[in-house]
A protein has these predicted regions:
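Structural preference for beta-strand elements that scaffold enzyme active sites
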Residues: 2-5, 52-55, 83-87, 110-114, ...
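Glycine-rich phosphate-binding "P-loop"
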Residues: 60-61, 115-134
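Acidic-and-aromatic substrate-binding clefts and catalytic sites of carbohydrate-active enzymes
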Residues: 33, 60-67, 90-97, 157-163, ...
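Catalytic pocket-lining loop regions of alpha/beta-barrel enzymes
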Residues: 129-211
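A cross-domain feature marking catalytic cores of carbohydrate-active enzymes
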Residues: 8-10, 57-59, 87-92, 114-117, ...
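Short, electropositive alpha-helical surface patch
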Residues: 64-79, 165-178
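An N-terminally biased module of ancient metal coordination in phosphate/nucleic-acid-related enzymes
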Residues: 1-74
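Generic structural signal for well-ordered alpha-helices
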Residues: 39-44, 70-74, 97-102, 139-143, ...
Length: 211
């Protein structure tokens, strides 16, 4: 069976700093990730599968020049054939972001943008965003630019934010949204899972959303 890996990461610690590797993480100890993971590693892990294409999701984040990562990933693709699509990073809380989006789009494999949305008030470990950005006017203005550049948006968020996300998604029906990591469920108790399931059902009402 032919497979497209729709969400993977590649990093080279000799090329970029990855500050998130040193931050407290909701999943606990991630020290085992502090090794390079390159295209050859991806292909080795998939050697028993018919992997025909892949989509790389940004993994530097929180940096001043995110286009550098896009340029690097495009060079990997040009040399090794993977990845085929790039979901890149831009800080959607910046007012002057359009020029950076244009720079990302100079690289032929650019397909979308991800800005981590996860936020829980007074819970810094579980908050990747500095505030609830889904209701922020600067964020909404930048999000609207995706239609102009024919880019998708990867949504990484908690179920408590699904209603905000749904309102945004419905306001821009021509922007495709990809819900990351099955909507990032955190707990296994039935009340939590029920809220998560019901939230996904709400998001599923929008035809411009995929999981």
């Amino acid at each position: 069976m032919k497979i497209i890996d729709a969400h993977h990461h590649t990093w080279d610690l000799s090329v970029f700093p990855y500050s998130w590797m040193n931050d407290p993480h909701p999943t606990g100890d991630i020290s085992h990730l502090k090794n390079n993971y390159l295209i050859d590693d991806l292909l080795e892990d998939a050697k028993n599968l018919e992997l025909i294409k892949s989509v790389h999701i940004q993994c530097r984040g929180g940096i001043n020049s995110p286009v550098e990562e896009t340029k690097w990933l495009q060079s990997l693709s040009d040399k090794q054939g993977f990845p085929h699509g790039l979901v890149v990073y831009s800080n959607f809380l910046r007012a002057d972001i359009e020029k950076e989006i244009e720079e990302h789009c100079q690289f032929k494999n650019t397909r979308g943008i991800r800005y981590l949305l996860n936020y829980i008030n007074n819970d810094p470990i579980n908050s990747f965003a500095p505030k609830e950005v889904l209701i922020n006017n600067t964020f909404k203005k930048n999000y609207s630019l995706l239609e102009k550049y024919n880019l998708s948006f990867d949504m990484h968020l908690w179920w408590t934010q699904y209603n905000y996300a749904f309102d945004l998604i419905k306001s821009y029906p021509n922007i495709l949204n990809i819900i990351n990591h099955a909507g990032t469920p955190q707990k296994r108790d039935e009340e939590y899972l029920s809220n998560w399931r019901n939230g996904l059902k709400t998001l599923a009402q929008a035809s411009n959303t995929v999981l």
